[in-house]
Amino acid sequence: MDFASSKKRKFKDANGVKPSKGKKSSSIPDKKSKKVKRAEPEPHDEPEDDSSDEEEQALKEVEDESDQADEDVEAANSAEEEEEEGGDEDNAENNTDLPNGGQLTLPPVAGAEAQSFEELKLSEKTMKAINEMKFTKMTEIQRRGIPPSLAGRDVLGAAKTGSGKTLAFLIPVIEMLSSLRFKPRNGTGVIVVSPTRELALQIFGVARELMAHHSQTYGIVIGGANRRAEAEKLAKGVNLLIATPGRLLDHLQNTPFVFKNLKSLVIDEADRILEIGFEDEMRQIIKVLPKEDRQTMLFSATQTTKVEDLARISLRPGPLYINVDEEKQYSTVEGLEQGYIICETDMRFLLLFSFLKRNLKKKIIVFFSSCACVKYHAELLNYIDLPVLDLHGKQKQQKRTNTFFEFCNAKQGTLICTDVAARGLDIPSVDWIIQFDPPDDPRDYIHRVGRTARGSNNKGRSLMFLQPNELGFLSHLKAARVPVAEFNFPTKKIINVQSQLEKLISQNYYLNKSAKDGYRSYMHAYASHSLRSVFDINKLDLAKVAKSFGFTQPPRVDITLGASMSRDKKQQGRRAYGSQPRQNQGNKFTR
């Protein structure tokens, strides 16, 4: 039997699922097949990044930590495996079944009245990690979610951002892995699916701390990372796996690894996963994964029709529904001071520049509507000696990872970004959230401002820029139980650098090109806004918009409304706000 067919047979034996036909297998040779050359896997969701060593440094740190965890586990488990298997190493390597047939025997758990982690009667190893992380009292989602999850219940949870749900799902699954004595050879027992790479990295970091004293393995697979290295680790055995949907489906279909023992599936930020176009991938993932005795926990900030459909196919009948926000007066967290400022279109950049200059010692996140807008403003601000970091979806993964951790570790500074940073990310000590471009609807607003005032005793402030024609958005925020007040920024305190800006843009070829791209993308984003009754492109003064980008006259760019319909397709079916996308009207605003 040749090597490829033997690996397919081994994969089938381990999981009862055949590798996808017509694609190369990213198989990892076993110890008896060292001389056989490995087949290169074909990327499924994003191409592998083969850029410079400097760009790979950020992800390398995560990979090194995962490698070290694997080494520690192998050393810790070697004696136990010899004892349990009677010293038969070959049998231990090939036997992927769980001890005791995978029967879960967790200690009695505390009821909903438990207030502290101590009352949950968790394992000594988990409690030691929680104490080292300085957690004592539970948040509401933890108090209501952890006990039933420890008991094996399926959970459908709704909680606002910053509520502590990461611990709410990680603690129960780690306890389960420990109770079942999972080892690398048993394969993957828990999969956590996250919408974005940054959120997946963040969950991975929390899992690493919680599992510091446990012997089980953990790992992460995300788009843009080294797929071959991921496949090798999966073949060795990753008990707790954090993943983004596209890369997870890729490995499930093309990488031979053991997942027949899967006991728990966690879907975090389910509404966001569906919003960004991973509905088909999630359906395929759920279809491939074992269903028998599998616990599923699904968390979503909003309960849309698509989320309900996903819950229906993934959860067992009679799940526990937890909504910690239904009785709250406001949809945003306490300790958050929220406001807006009315600003003429041509003054928007000057106001932003003046605000950032006055708050150089603060930690600030500024949200823009498109990648090109982020790129232009980052290049411009850094060029004029106002240092900022930038984060958006068109960057290479190494760059995104490096920027994310650099800003997390910074005590002060400014990050300008798209909504890639708006969901779930726990960035410490953010003082201000600036929404330079308006969000697509109140739900996105809530997630943006959720990057500050996180935790039980933290404070934070947010500021939204609104043009005079956009004030109708305030009524939508009010309907969504979001309290905002008008802020004033004295005109005399605005630093007028308009003439210098226009001179710079006219003379610097690269900034001019970047400004033109930003202008075009801003108009496209505005044209495809879901709340078109409020954000009407026909009401924009294009001369003022151009001026805010540093042009004396609107540049000659095609900003056909129909050109933005690809973005509309991503929005359709997920928005409860605003009108349906318009048909291609063929209107052009070309200068």
UniProtKB/Swiss-Prot annotation:
Compositionally biased tracts (Acidic residues): 45-92
Q: What does this protein do?
A: ATP-dependent RNA helicase involved in 40S ribosomal subunit biogenesis. Required for the processing and cleavage of 35S pre-rRNA at sites A0, A1, and A2, leading to mature 18S rRNA.
One Pfam family in the UniProt entry: DEAD
Indicate which residues form the motif DEAD box: 268-271
Q: Which domain of life is it from?
A: Eukaryota
Cell compartment(s), UniProt: Nucleus, Nucleolus
Bias (Basic residues) ranges: 1-11
Find motif (Bipartite nuclear localization signal) and give its ranges. Answer: 347-363
Name of this protein: ATP-dependent RNA helicase HAS1
**Entry keyword annotation includes Hydrolase:** yes
Q: Give the EC number(s) under which this enzyme is classified.
A: 3.6.4.13
* Binding sites annotated in the UniProt record for ATP: 159-166
Concerning PROSITE patterns, the annotation shows: DEAD_ATP_HELICASE, HELICASE_ATP_BIND_1, HELICASE_CTER, Q_MOTIF
Q: Which reaction does it catalyse?
A: ATP + H2O = ADP + phosphate + H(+)
Organism equals: Gibberella zeae (strain ATCC MYA-4620 / CBS 123657 / FGSC 9075 / NRRL 31084 / PH-1) (Wheat head blight fungus)
What residue stretches are annotated with the Helicase ATP-binding domain?
146-321
GO BP: rRNA processing
